[in-house]
């Protein structure tokens, strides 16, 4: 089973990191890594939006295709 959520039109796979005792999300289909961590689902969406925004802004500044 794959745990996938959608944040602002982008899919991210979600897993539990037992060492950190946190949820970890990683966006799919992007040209670079954009991952995020949170202690709960609400925080995961909040951190995911922030991570995606930073990634997309950096791509725009550098003229890089974000891949999606």
Describe each region flagged by the PLM.
Residues 13-35:
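A short, structured beta-strand/loop element
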Residues 33-43:
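Short, surface-exposed polybasic/aromatic micro-patch for ligand or macromolecular engagement
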